[in-house]
């Protein structure tokens, strides 16, 4: 049996594990994840492109990639970009690793982290990322749980430190209260500017957007997605 150790911090709330993993998934967690996982016990390289065996021109981060569908899609379309994917939910990580067995060409420009994203953000060098995606994060819809949302001023300070000037933080949700919450925090932070001029700018999916399983469910249930983009000043 694999002991999948995690370390909780002030920013993580929720399940680490759901359905029982199949033996094939457990094998990928044991054998493949260690080859791709970022070890925070080592110092971060000044140039993050050195994390990747393949030559990459830039590095982007996706926080909470779920089963990895969007991340895999991005790697298909941006082969000269190095990607860092964070997913503390072990079932999502296992699904991603299974997909990587079928897309081995992506392994050389992908690095993974299976714990709290704030730990990774604190480890990264200043102005080291060319983009950050946070797509359909847990909205914690009950008001008493809103403090558990990833978007807060402390985490925006983290994001502002590691994101390069002129680069984008993209946020998608189908929960209106979380969209409004996110707008409030970003527009009250001195390091970001909201990239929007009219309604279609936050109702139109991002370029090359593949959609997600969660988004399909939201649309079936009558919820309208919101796509927010913020530029680091």
UniProtKB/Swiss-Prot annotation:
Lineage top rank: taxon: Bacteria
GO MF, one example: tRNA (guanine(46)-N7)-methyltransferase activity
Pfam families: Methyltransf_4
Key words of the record: Methyltransferase, S-adenosyl-L-methionine, Transferase, tRNA processing
GO cellular component: tRNA methyltransferase complex
Listed InterPro entries: SAM-dependent_MTases_sf (IPR029063), tRNA_(Gua-N-7)_MeTrfase_Trmb (IPR003358), tRNA_methyltr_TrmB_bact (IPR055361)
Residue numbers binding substrate: 142, 174, 212-215
Active site residues per record: 138
Reaction(s) this enzyme catalyzes, per UniProt: guanosine(46) in tRNA + S-adenosyl-L-methionine = N(7)-methylguanosine(46) in tRNA + S-adenosyl-L-homocysteine
Classification via PROSITE patterns: SAM_MT_TRMB
Residues noted as binding S-adenosyl-L-methionine in the record, renumbered to the chain: 62, 87, 116, 138
Top enzyme class: transferase
Pathway: tRNA modification; N(7)-methylguanine-tRNA biosynthesis
EC number: 2.1.1.33
Family: Belongs to the class I-like SAM-binding methyltransferase superfamily. TrmB family.
HAMAP family, alphabetized: tRNA_methyltr_TrmB (MF_01057)
Function: Catalyzes the formation of N(7)-methylguanine at position 46 (m7G46) in tRNA.
Identification of the protein by name: tRNA (guanine-N(7)-)-methyltransferase
Biological classification of the source: Bacteria, Pseudomonadati, Pseudomonadota, Alphaproteobacteria, Hyphomicrobiales
Gene: trmB
């Amino acid at each position: 049996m694999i002991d999948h150790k995690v370390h909780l911090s002030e920013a993580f709330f929720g399940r680490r594990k759901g359905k029982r993993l199949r033996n094939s998934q457990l094998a990928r967690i044991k054998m493949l994840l260690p080859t791709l996982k970022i070890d925070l016990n080592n110092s971060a390289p000044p140039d993050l492109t050195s994390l990747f065996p393949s030559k990459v021109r830039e590095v982007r981060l996706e926080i909470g990639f779920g089963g990895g569908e969007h991340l895999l899609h991005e790697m298909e379309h941006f082969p000269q970009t190095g990607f860092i994917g964070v997913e503390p939910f072990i079932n999502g990580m296992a699904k991603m690793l299974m997909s990587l067995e079928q897309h081995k060409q992506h392994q050389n420009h992908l690095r993974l982290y299976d714990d709290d994203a704030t730990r990774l953000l604190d480890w990264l060098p200043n102005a080291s990322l060319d983009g950050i995606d946070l797509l359909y994060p847990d909205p914690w819809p009950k008001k008493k749980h809103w403090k558990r949302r990833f978007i807060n001023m402390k985490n925006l300070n983290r994001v502002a430190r590691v994101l390069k000037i002129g680069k984008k933080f993209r946020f998608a949700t189908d929960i209106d209260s979380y969209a409004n919450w996110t707008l409030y925090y970003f527009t009250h932070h001195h390091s970001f500017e909201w990239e929007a001029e009219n309604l279609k700018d936050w109702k139109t999916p991002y370029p090359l957007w593949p959609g997600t399983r969660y988004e399909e469910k939201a649309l079936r249930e009558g919820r309208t997605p919101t796509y927010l983009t913020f530029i680091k000043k």
